[in-house]
Amino acid sequence: MEKKRYRPNVAAIVLSSNYPKKVEFFIAARSDVPDSWQFPQGGIDKGESPKEALLRELKEEIGTDKIEIIAEFPEWVSYDFPKKIAKKMYPYDGQTQKYFLVKLKPEAKIDLDTKEPEFNDYKFVPYKDLFHYVTFFKRPVYKKVLEYFKKEGYF
């Protein structure tokens, strides 16, 4: 059996600037997939550290890198693409991700009208509503990572 290939990637669990008073998670709707909400994420370029990729991806996807890194998930987490998406993402079968828990700085301004827009809408939602929006194949990874940060006392 052929070994699966995973694309190295970073993902940001973005909390509003109201954190820790109010715990609200930033999620965005993909412009290319209707009703598909997710956290900002993106590939790690050759020679780039995960933290450098995190800042670059946030700037590219949500128009700001004005964040404070609160914590980092201690391991890399992988998931497989659904068949429909896998064809588009060839040669990769899925992604292996490094997750960061970050807080927007008060001066941060979200702007989805970026050079290559990936999202067409965003909202801040409480934890209890998060999985109502998140696309199905990302839910297990999101649950694992969020449960860890919850257990560690971040929210």
UniProtKB/Swiss-Prot annotation:
Keywords: Hydrolase. InterPro entries: Nudix_hydrolase, NUDIX_hydrolase-like_dom_sf, NUDIX_hydrolase_CS, NUDIX_hydrolase_dom, RppH. SUPFAM superfamilies: Nudix. It holds the Pfam family NUDIX. Its EC number is 3.6.1.-. Its cofactor is a divalent metal cation. One of its GO terms (molecular function) is bis(5'-adenosyl)-pentaphosphatase activity. The keyword Nucleotide-binding does not apply. A motif (Nudix box) lies at residues 42-63. The keyword Hydrolase applies. Belongs to the Nudix hydrolase family. RppH subfamily. Accelerates the degradation of transcripts by removing pyrophosphate from the 5'-end of triphosphorylated RNA, leading to a more labile monophosphorylated state that can stimulate subsequent ribonuclease cleavage. This is RNA pyrophosphohydrolase. The lineage of its organism: Bacteria, Pseudomonadati, Campylobacterota, Epsilonproteobacteria, Nautiliales.
